[in-house]
Amino acid sequence: MSAAEKGQTVKERARDALGNDFLRSAVRFTTERLRLGKKLAAEEHGNWDDWRERGRQIRLHTIAHLDYYLNEFAENARANGAHVHFADTAEEAVAISLEIAKHASAKSVVKSKSMVSEELHLNQALDSIGVEAIETDLGEYIIQLANETPSHIIIPAIHKNRHQIAGLLSREAGEDLPADTAVLAGFVRTKLREKFLAADIGMTGCNFAIAETGSMVLFENEGNARMVTTVPKTQITLMGMERIIPSWSDLEVMATLLPRSATGQKLTVYMSGITGPRREQDADGPDQMHIIIIDNGRSLQLGDPEFQELLNCIRCGACLNACPVYRHIGGHAYGGTYSGPIGAVLTPALKKNVAEWDDIANASSLCGACYEACPVKIPLHDMLVYLRRRKVEAGRGNKAETLGMKGFSVVMGNAKRYRNVVRLGKLGQKLVVRNGEIRVRIGPLKGWNTYRVTPELPKDSFWDRWSKVEQELHSDSMPMNPEVADRLSKLMDQRKNGGHGQ
């Protein structure tokens, strides 16, 4: 169960995260390393923005013709011998998965990394019918032992150090294991090898599905996905409906963008293309392959001019690494399966109760770093503004904030009214100004002054100073530099004639 489902708000989760010094340090260190790796990889490749635009155009075209490419993929996948299922909701996808497990009389399922599986809460569903689900990605395995959810799309256990991991694995081993990376990885490798050999079903996600051949492509660094797709007799692939690309030639662009954006690699250690179940001449592979194509709210974005580009996402995690908010609070503070800027937009899109996730759109500074990092140029910062606007239009906005903005508009809409308010502010601030600073933490100043200092209103405003300049310009008693006087005189003439000056 997520933090949001337990009743915590975004603010409460963020406050908890900000109070966790280790979490902030670990997330900041790892995201900075990933961000720098991506930057260097992009610079080394060259023409990066051109490649981003190529990727964007491929995704725009694919999503605009999604029904065509989904049908093409399904037809070709079935021709290859795979069983293709379409699930409108998370509940349908889970029901299909459980039915396959029951038909196979499965006792255990080995899984490679899949955010869609997390989205469906599939492990809990499998456990409810007595099927053991084992995560085989190292980070996911650690998170599973800790009974937690991933806090990063690419690095699920970004919030844990090796000493914490050693404690989890020692409990699993029944003996104390040293906090040595090689020893810990060796233990997990041995443990999982037994699970691979005993598993009845292998379950994967899908990085890209190739419509022209009905193939699926998986990117990974550990080799566990290869084991998942070759050892068990039955394979289930969970695939968000937007994972389609038209052709293998399009994969060249995506294979250039995804690894560099995710981890700074030219290419992941393993890239597997899977086309149907095992054939007679194949040495390994599943006897049965099931592909579950999942909607779960995705189709609601189709045709929406503000949010359709959300479906362009290739799940690289670059926006998380660039986001100053994510780098301070980590992933769990967002409360859903997906975190960071993409999660702040995608979570409300996938959840039925949008109002429950209203505040998540405020977990952003709107700086646009996510857009600059995105390999397919998704304008996430604009989408966050759209979400905020829709919340207000639906009558779910903060009443005090709405009243304050209306008051601000009234004041700023009239110069005389603005000057009068400033004069009142100068009088009122005398009660709280100390040494030129306002440090009180009450009312609207509480949030700001907790971490910063509000400067006092200056004695002379810009308007006051400009009025003095005009007086000096037209006064014989106060001589002015002739060159300055000439420029100001021309400026004043232009203002009178409706110009803007040079």
Model-derived regions: residue spans:
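Predominant activation on well-ordered alpha-helical scaffold segments within soluble catalytic domains
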Residues: A74, N123, S249-E252, G317, ...
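The feature marks the mature, well-folded catalytic cores of soluble enzymes
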Residues: M1-E306
